[in-house]
Amino acid sequence: MLKLNLEGIYNFLDWHNYAQTFAPQIKVIHQKLHQDQQLKEKYLGWLELPLHFDFQELEKMKQLKNSHPNLDVLVVIGIGGSYLGAKAGIEFLQTPFKKTKPEILFAGHQASGNYLTNLLHYLKDKNWAINVISKSGITLEPALAFRILKKEIEEKYGKQLAKNRIFVTTDSQKGVLLNLALKEGYQTFVIPDSVGGRFSVFTSVGILPFVFANLDVVSMMKGALQAYHDTFQEDLFQNQAYQYALARYLLHTQQNKKMELLVSYEPHLLSFSEWWKQLFAESEGKEEKGLFVGATNNSTDLHSLGQFIQEGTKMLFETVLNVTSIKDDCVVPHIPNELDNLNYVAGKTYSQINQKILQATKQAHIEGKVPNLEIVIPTLDAYHFGYLAYFFQKACAMSGSLLGINPFNQPGVEIYKQKMFALLKS
């Protein structure tokens, strides 16, 4: 189970005093999140998803996958929350060195013609299908990618057969993509109207790619459900998600920290960190408020960003994701008459070495005046992916509410789009 370790901030904050002070406010925010019907209907469709997960819809997705037994590749088209959750879950749970069928590839998450051209070349001799994800259907990058991939798949299989290889995840009532899907006769799945993209990982947005990737969705939702129950506590002292939210809020407002780094020590967590960045940046970065969020993957980044973190501007704090047990591990062999001077670690596993690196780094950074939060999970499995993703969603809702902003909208992203469309149409 997840454990939050706050010891790395005690030298910087009178945590216990602040916690007593903010506990009543957190209780009020919790009650608003769970009882404000208007708020729930507009923004909080994700809040009780683990409680009311649609297992019939899951079976429908499994049947769809089973109807394509020889599929080599599923191309998931989406950007932002329409792909980050799926990519995070798949990379959290699968090794890049063991190719499973179908392989899940992504498109429409940038505007690179080079990427798309090479993807099309890769698909030439593959048996493939498309899952296009967009609530509106007008987001430029996925819409363009879908236009090109749709043309390609229709040329390869013919229009009639191609329509059975295109799965659309979109709004249930309106939108360009829904209209196109209905006209063409594509299989559709629903993005709930009250669920924003960055909170959509447990909807069909994430679940359909997870099914095609052969992930254990049932265990994942058990983890999310346990996180729902654990974070349903209105008492700050019984709710680790709220403690994390308050800690980062206090480091920002009382210690003037401008940036939070999510620090991981497993490559499997790289895409999870990208998902986390969108969750917090898009939720909190408004009204000239909020922390800038970034991520590092150690020990790799200790050899690049480590110098700045240790001795640079004291603008940041770290949240360390500590995975204490790894299923696949490697033992350092003992070599007689060693020439590489490494027998001092002979017999140790890489996990044991990684843990020592983590502990040493945390200690050094705290001594270097960099506060550290630590979130500990026992392993990388479907259950803990579900738990961790829901934990951060709930923490984000509380953290943004403490800032006094609406954590569930994103008005700022429309500004560049307006200018972009004006330039493209001029």
From Swiss-Prot:
Pathway-wise, it operates in: Carbohydrate biosynthesis; gluconeogenesis; Carbohydrate degradation; glycolysis; D-glyceraldehyde 3-phosphate and glycerone phosphate from D-glucose: step 2/4
Q: Where in the cell is it found?
A: Cytoplasm
Q: Can the keyword Cytoplasm be found in this entry's annotation?
A: yes
Task: Name the coiled-coil region(s).
Answer: none
Any one GO CC term of this protein is:
cytosol
Q: Which domain of life is it from?
A: Bacteria
Q: Short name of one Pfam family for this protein?
A: PGI
Keywords of the record, alphabetical order, are:
Cytoplasm, Gluconeogenesis, Glycolysis, Isomerase
Enzyme Commission no: 5.3.1.9
Q: Which reaction does it catalyse?
A: alpha-D-glucose 6-phosphate = beta-D-fructose 6-phosphate
- The main location class comes to cytoplasm
A single BP term in Gene Ontology: glycolytic process
* MF terms (GO), sorted A to Z: carbohydrate derivative binding; glucose-6-phosphate isomerase activity; monosaccharide binding
What are the catalytic residues?
Answer: 282, 303, 417
- The reply on keyword Signal is no
Q: What does this protein do?
A: Catalyzes the reversible isomerization of glucose-6-phosphate to fructose-6-phosphate.
NCBIfam families in the record: PRK14097.1 (NF010697)
UniProt record similarity statement: Belongs to the GPI family.
Q: What's the protein name?
A: Glucose-6-phosphate isomerase
